[in-house]
Amino acid sequence: METHSSGRGLAAALACCALITLVLLANHPAGGGHSLTEVISAEARDRTADALVHGGFVITLTALIVCLVSVARTLGIARPIVLTGLVSFCVGSGMLMLSMILDGLAVPAIATRFIGITDPSALLPARTALMLCGVLIGILMPFGLLLQAATMLSWSIAIAARRGLPLAAAIYGILATALIAGGLLLAPAAMSGHLLLGAIVLLALWYGALALLVGTRAIAHR
């Protein structure tokens, strides 16, 4: 009875993480501006919203790591394919957390320090700092999502031999991984923003699928 209750609790936690991820994504500040002063103004204006959304992502990713450790134990954490997926998710989440901190806290803080300044020479440090943050975010976020997609792939392979819901979830995981990897690695740079958002949505749906599998006890280790 205790095991069943803990399974339902884990399923509820995964479902909440999936839902919160989608809600945070829907409320992500749009930013805006073309010139440096416009970008600084927009980032400073949205500082509170940025902190809430990106801070929420960091907390959610932390909760997901805890949840996926429990799922890995259910799948059989000693299995190489399961352990590899867990490590990949943890590393990917760490990269995403750093990206979120830069995007949601560092960039708005930098912008706030330079709000109202119009002298190009005085804005040079802001341009340099914002460019550095942008480069780091552009590296950390795609790689973090790819590592999380690798977890989805490895765990999908781990449950692909089963019938019913596990097989359906495995097929989804494999297809979603192909879409994420293909999009992030092959698509034009101009589409990168939309592809990153799409990857987060696909991963959130996978968390929901894991919640269903755990809640129905369809992936207990055999």
Describe the function of each predicted region:
Residues 1-222:
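Hydrophobic, aromatic-enriched alpha-helical segments typical of multi-pass transmembrane helices
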